[in-house]
Design a protein with these regions (language model features):
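Terminal, basic amphipathic appendages of nucleotide-handling enzymes
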Residues: 2-79
Length: 79
């Protein structure tokens, strides 16, 4: 399992922007991969902006709450 940072897709900008959010994943992701990121409000399209994030950079209180990315963005992959 590795930690990655992603930025969410912003339709109004037609791109990926904003703060980076940390997720765990077992997928062999690379920077630039498009994925589906689960959030409290539902699934969001996102782009991986950093891989192999050290656990020390994530607040230990947040670690048990991290959600897992389990799929690539199929819509983006078909484009």
């Amino acid at each position: 399992m590795m930690l990655v940072n992603v930025r969410y897709f912003k339709p109004q900008l037609n791109g990926y922007a904003g703060n980076a959010f940390t997720y765990k994943t077992a997928l062999p992701l690379k920077v630039g991969d498009r994925v589906i990121a689960p959030t409290r409000g539902g699934d969001n399209r996102a782009m991986v902006v950093e891989i192999n994030v050290p656990e020390g950079r994530v607040d230990e209180r947040v670690m048990p709450l991290l959600r897992e990315i389990t799929q690539y963005d199929a819509e983006e992959a078909q484009a």
